[in-house]
Amino acid sequence: MLGEQIGSGQGKRTSRRVVAVEPVFKVEVSFEEMDKMLGIEGMNIGTYTSSPRPDGTLAGEGQGVFATLDGQTATWKGIGTGQLKPGGAVSYRGCLTYSTTAPKLARLNLIAGVFEFEVDATGNTQTKVWEWK
């Protein structure tokens, strides 16, 4: 069951590159967002790769770091499924795990997050994360 929303952010895709073409193509994407996690403002920087599946959906996995404005950090890893949308937009749904030694963010070590990640046709990103109870 979904619990409370624990995070949200908006930002921009910062790079894209093809990292494989066989047996199917794989694209690596990086992004930066100004986020709020557990009510704490900071920056989220992430990179994910995605490849098409036979049915046309996307399989993706990624990793990144959330840094509070005072320098405390938490890393994350995620996996998800996505779909291409008109104009090159992409929509993903998936789950996240976290790791941190930062006192402010320690609760993340006990959380599995469920996310929505949207990238519009111009590269603007939007993320929402809920606690999975």
Can you name each region flagged by the protein language model?
Residues 1-133:
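Beta-strand-enriched cores of mature, soluble protein domains
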